């Protein structure tokens, strides 16, 4: 149910670099959006939806806006992504991709791997690589760097206490940049149902999402 990929990188000791889930998601999402644009009337494009979880990169939303297709964020998990009306592509940063929801309306590593291989082959025929495509995104939309941090605990009560402290005390600064906006995901919104989590935005537009794992004794 997952798809992982590595690309040649001479700067790495192994000669290879593993792509992040967000990098693969942006590559596959852009590929799918372009396929949709080629066969869809312009007036219908906003109903053709790209989707990703709230803990995934914001890059896909910019790709969607640039190409004129729709985009939405969902809670973590494909039970949410797969429910998006008009879904044509969905992903989450934990290496899960839905590239053909008409046939497999769930994360599917086999179809995602074949689509990524096809994209790599198409780029190769042009004398380009997947890294070149990622560089195109950075030049057009700005660099989107993402990184997960997981804290495993033995005492589950520590997770609840940690989330309680974040809500009661808040954060004023992250990595030297003042926090300018805080969203308590437990309050829900007109776009998202309530979930246990906090989202922070800093003055330099960094974004940090803190949430408990839904399946393991971890804070992510």
Where do the language-model regions lie?
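Catalytic or ion-translocation cores adjacent to nucleophile or general acid/base/metal-coordination motifs
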Residues: 21-31
């Amino acid at each position: 149910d997952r798809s992982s990929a590595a690309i040649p990188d001479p700067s790495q000791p192994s000669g290879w670099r593993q792509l992040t889930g967000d990098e693969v998601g942006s590559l596959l999402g852009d590929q799918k959006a372009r396929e949709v644009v080629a066969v869809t009337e312009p007036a219908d494009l906003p109903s053709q939806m790209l989707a990703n979880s709230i803990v995934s990169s914001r890059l896909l939303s910019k790709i969607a806006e640039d190409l004129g297709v729709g985009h939405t964020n969902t809670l973590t998990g494909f039970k949410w992504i797969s429910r998006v009306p008009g879904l044509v592509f969905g992903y989450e940063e934990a290496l899960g991709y839905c590239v053909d929801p008409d046939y497999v309306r769930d994360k599917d590593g086999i179809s995602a791997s074949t689509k990524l291989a096809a994209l790599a082959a198409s780029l190769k025929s042009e004398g380009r690589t997947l890294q070149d495509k990622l560089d195109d995104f950075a030049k057009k939309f700005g660099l989107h760097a993402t990184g997960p941090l997981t804290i495993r605990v033995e005492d589950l009560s520590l997770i609840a206490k940690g989330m309680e402290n974040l809500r009661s005390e808040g954060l004023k600064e992250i990595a030297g940049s003042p926090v300018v906006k805080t969203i308590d995901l437990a309050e829900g919104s007109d776009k998202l149902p309530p979930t246990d989590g906090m989202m922070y935005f800093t003055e330099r537009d960094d974004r940090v999402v803190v949430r408990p794992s839904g399946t393991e004794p971890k804070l992510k």
